[in-house]
Amino acid sequence: MTLESKLKALLGPLVGGRAYPDVTPDKPEFPLIIYQGAGGQERWYVDGKRREKRHQRLQVFVWATTRAQASSIADQIGTALCESDFPAVEPYGSPTSLYEEAIKKYGTRQDFGIWFLPS
């Protein structure tokens, strides 16, 4: 299973399947989750072989109709990721609160470092 498909399977149930990589659909329904890669750690060894495990810095956004709903989903995301079967997950700080005036929605953003086995 790819990292993207595993994230979709893990995060989707928290918002009725509305978890998307990178961008929202054209006509989004809320609440929803957006996740995107934002770099990560890459390590090489003297023998020139790549490590078996890969690392991805993941930014996870929640958009919802209320602050309470956005915060609750963000908390569930942290629990789902940190209790998942990824080899290691590290939250980089707590969620940041957001508000998007153009769509009148409340949001959060939190970054995680995820070690995973590529498929």
Give the residues covered by each predicted segment.
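Small/polar-rich, solvent-exposed N-terminal microdomains that initiate assembly or binding
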Residues: 1-48, 68, 72-76
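Sterically constrained small-residue positions within well-ordered secondary structures
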Residues: 26, 49-51, 99-103
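A generic structural signal for short, non-catalytic loop/turn and secondary-structure boundary residues
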Residues: 27-28, 53, 84, 105
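Short, low-complexity, polar/charged sequence segments that are solvent-exposed and flexible
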Residues: 38-41, 52-57, 79-83
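Glycine-rich loops and low-complexity Gly/Arg-rich segments
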Residues: 44-46, 57-62, 84-88, 116-118
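Oligomerization/assembly interface segments of phage tail-like spikes and tubes
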Residues: 52-65, 106-117
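Short, positively charged, low-complexity/disordered linker segments
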Residues: 56-81
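Acidic-leaning, charged glycine-interspersed low-complexity segments
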Residues: 79-119
